[in-house]
């Protein structure tokens, strides 16, 4: 009844949070060079690779793309320049992960990610096009993205080849109105899971995240219209989306029903409405980075109620989240951040209906490692009482909650290559039967082109 699907979200979170540093490391390096020379020196020319950042996808509003200069071979042997001449941009990422419970709980069949040595690999490609070249207004951009995923533990990572983004983004009135329409998953637009991550996903997968339980799409894209309005400062915003829910059967069923990503509808999945109000501020010389948001989800799909086995009228959820830079030792985006999330949904139809998370991460933890990141965090996710009561009626023991504590370090080996090492202690790694605690070693080698 409780099906979980895993992707390396907790490891990807380390890499995505590094983008908060932006070009701060380049700025810091130039300041160091200037201070060592007593006489004025010419301002270094802007790196050519920075010109290609305008072609990075803008479709993923909740995730900041890694700058082109921070990737492997920024020029791609002249390919990026040739594409840019025609209004095109291209990027690719490859995530290659390993997870294993070092406490030695190997078993067949495997019931959670990492119980036996678990491997996964993915390739993500992005192609963008400047639509102003064909008459669209302002900064309109089209994004086409695709993903291949492979793994040896397929209940956690089904082997898929799918489209992930097929959408247009454009803004009006100096970015006070922004539109996103097409196929895209909700996690790329809302919530901000990439900041701080969620320690529970190490063993349970993204289905352990409450908004995904309620129907927000995490992997396969859904047809979406997203309208973002901002005040004149561009800091306060409201983001409202009409989209399709994932299958009420869960993420794995949604992948089965929509393997290509292009399906307009899937069985039993109806309209989902998402609204997020927030305040977002980038780091500057005088201000710390901050992002506070509150969101609600209303799903018109009919879910099977655990106790009655009847169909519900709807499903809904809400979340509060905040990410705040609390130190700025070098006057830029580097430093310590605190991230917290609080999620809620009804326990009549959602297997995990409440969660609370706290994370602290440090971008640029050492003066000579400005592109690294260190993170520690804890997540407590609560299983539905109504679902536990159903299992108790059959004499089956179940966990009340799962508690996961994680620590990780992301090291930039060279521009565009990151090694992320993590250790996650998980109390109750499965719902039923009650299982011994797990200590998951996670390694991920990531390549960004």
Residue ranges and their predicted role:
Residues 2, 18-20, 25-95:
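N-terminal periplasmic/intermembrane-space "pro-region" immediately following the signal or transit peptide
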Residues 78-80, 126-128, 167-169, 226-228, ...:
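Outer-membrane beta-barrel architecture
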Residues 148-167, 174-269, 392, 397:
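Surface-exposed coil loops of outer-membrane beta-barrel proteins
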Residues 249-267, 272, 276-278, 296-312, ...:
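Outer membrane beta-barrel transmembrane domains
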Residues 30-32, 67, 73-90, 102, ...:
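Short loop/turn motifs that connect adjacent beta-strands in outer-membrane beta-barrel proteins
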Residues 90-98, 142-148, 179-185, 238-244, ...:
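Transmembrane beta-barrel strands of outer-membrane/channel proteins
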Residues 437-449:
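Outer-membrane beta-barrel "beta-signal"
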Residues 99-121, 133-172, 265, 429-431:
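Surface-exposed loop and membrane-interface regions of Gram-negative outer-membrane beta-barrel proteins
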């Amino acid at each position: 009844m409780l099906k979980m699907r895993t992707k390396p979200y907790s490891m990807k979170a380390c890499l995505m949070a590094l983008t908060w540093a932006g070009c701060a490391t380049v700025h810091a390096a130039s300041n160091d060079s200037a201070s060592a020379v007593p006489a004025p020196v010419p301002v270094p020319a802007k790196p050519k690779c920075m010109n290609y950042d305008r072609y990075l996808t803008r479709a993923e509003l909740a995730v900041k793309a890694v700058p082109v200069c921070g990737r492997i071979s920024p020029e791609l042997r002249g390919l990026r320049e040739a594409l840019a001449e025609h209004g095109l941009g291209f990027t690719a990422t490859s995530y290659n992960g390993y997870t294993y419970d070092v406490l030695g709980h190997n078993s067949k069949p495997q019931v959670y990610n990492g119980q036996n040595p678990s491997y996964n690999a993915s390739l993500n490609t992005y192609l963008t096009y400047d639509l102003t070249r064909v008459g669209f207004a302002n900064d309109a951009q089209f994004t086409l993205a695709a993903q291949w995923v492979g793994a040896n533990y397929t209940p956690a990572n089904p082997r898929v080849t799918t489209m992930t983004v097929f959408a247009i983004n454009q803004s009006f009135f100096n970015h006070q109105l922004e539109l996103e329409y097409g196929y895209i998953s909700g996690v790329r637009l809302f919530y901000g899971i990439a900041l701080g991550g969620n320690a529970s996903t190490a063993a349970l997968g993204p289905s352990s995240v409450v908004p995904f339980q309620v129907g927000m799409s995490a992997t396969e894209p859904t047809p979406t219209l997203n309208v973002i309005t901002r005040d004149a400062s561009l800091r306060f915003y409201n983001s409202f989306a009409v989209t399709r829910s994932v299958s009420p059967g869960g993420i794995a069923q949604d992948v089965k029903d929509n393997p290509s990503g292009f399906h307009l509808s899937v069985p039993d999945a109806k309209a989902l409405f998402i609204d997020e109000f927030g305040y977002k501020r980038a780091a500057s010389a005088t201000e710390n980075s901050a992002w506070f948001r509150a969101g609600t989800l209303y799903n018109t799909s009919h879910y099977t109620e655990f106790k009655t086995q009847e169909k519900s009228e709807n499903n809904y959820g809400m979340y509060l989240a905040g990410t705040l830079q609390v130190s700025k030792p070098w006057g830029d985006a580097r430093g310590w951040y605190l991230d917290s999330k609080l999620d809620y949904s009804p326990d009549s139809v959602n297997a995990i209906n409440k969660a609370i998370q706290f994370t602290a991460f440090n971008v640029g933890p050492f003066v000579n490692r400005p592109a690294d990141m260190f993170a520690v965090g804890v997540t407590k996710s609560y299983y539905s009482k109504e679902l536990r009561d159903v299992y108790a009626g059959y004499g089956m023991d179940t966990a009340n909650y799962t508690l996961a504590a994680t620590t990780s370090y992301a090291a930039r080996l060279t521009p565009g290559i990151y090694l992320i090492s993590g250790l996650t202690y998980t109390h109750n790694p499965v719902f039923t039967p009650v299982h011994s605690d797990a200590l998951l070693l996670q390694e991920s080698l990531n390549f960004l082109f």
